[in-house]
């Protein structure tokens, strides 16, 4: 029984770790998207300031080119994180299923033990009742 409790604690710990990892990745994705949006606004502002919208133009602002490059890097990183997030969610689902299996086994064992205890108690009560009946039957 002790080993089952340890296994349940282990499975809960694994679920918590996988949940934390998933949240961490989702937070990183949100942060990268926020940063990408800021870079997009900065590029637009720089283009408006220079009056040049075409990145191929010889006088296109250097800062805008650099910001576009950083934005593209962030988008690639975000895409990679989305794949990691999907994998983390799948791992979380598997860990949760493993936890549920162990908890169900534990619950089934507890129900069986309770039924056995109830049966023992009922047998003891039946034995006592039979002794009383025999004792009272002998006096009548």
Protein language model annotation of sequence segments:
Residues 1-140:
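Charge-rich amphipathic alpha-helical interaction elements
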